[in-house]
Amino acid sequence: MLLFWLSLAVGAIGSAAITLSCGLVGAWYDFYIPVLLFFGFAFACVALAFLFAFILSLFSDKKKPVDRQNRLYAFVFHTINAYLIFMSRAKVKVIGLDKLDKAQNYLIICNHLSRFDPMIIENRVKNKPLAFASKPGNFRIPIVGGVIHKCGYVSINRENDREALKTILHVCKMVENTGMSYGIFPEGTRNTEPQKGLLPFRAGALKIAQRCGIPIAVFVTRNTNSIHKRFPFRSTKVELELLEVIDAETVKTTSTVDLAKRAKDEMESALYGKVIDRQTE
């Protein structure tokens, strides 16, 4: 976010300096010259951030596990996220963050409507460094894959229990050593028909909280799936709400199936005003 505002400041100063030094102000249409220069400078600074991310991705070996979040990669990634949220014209209302203990790390779970969901959560939940469990395909995206790997993102192999456990233990090691929080979407994929209710939850995803001995923070997002439909001509009001925190002791003594049902019921009550009868996987 700092880089974004810095880019605007540089754009403003640069456009004003060029306008004054060249004596460009004269006719009414000359007003647009500093405006164009302003956005030109801002765009150039953001383009440099993307170029920097590309260069950083060249030094990311995705086959080599990371033991902590790289601050430089995280800074660049979060700055670009903040810029994309701003440019999408998403107006984010955050509710209930006061329920989080700033000294505590969490497993953050949320419904999944849009690609903007993890971006908004990362941008607004700032008490601890945060990474997500992501699908394998995201690590194959040019630039993005290398950067998120260095940010501590992991891919959980749901088809291989042994590999999944290995990844969960690795996550717990990072949580213990660095105090990170982790986010996961228990629906497993984006819900393209949210009007029908939440998708079945993958209860195994909550094993991260049990193995790591951390609380579960239950969030919901609202209307993030409308952002791409309204962009660029209309802004979109979206919400990120923290519904409840399931304490570590309850997480430890409750089965993942029961935890998943509790979280899913809580989310559906908040989103639809009722619990929708669907299975938990």
Language-model-detected regions and their locations in the chain:
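A generic local structural motif
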Residues: T79-I80, V92-G96, P118-M119, I168-V171, ...
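Catalytic core of membrane glycerolipid acyltransferases/transacylases, capturing the structured
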Residues: S57-H78, F86-M87, K102-D161
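Generic preference for hydrophobic
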Residues: V94, I108, F132, L240-L242
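Short acidic-hydrophobic, aromatic-tinged amphipathic segments that line or gate anion-handling sites
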Residues: V94-I95, V154-N157, A248
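Short, well-ordered coil/turn elements that cap or connect secondary structure elements
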Residues: M87-R89, N127, I148-K150, N177, ...
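Non-catalytic C-terminal accessory region of glycerolipid acyltransferases
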Residues: L8, L165-E281
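Membrane-anchoring hydrophobic helices of lipid-metabolizing enzymes
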Residues: L2-N105
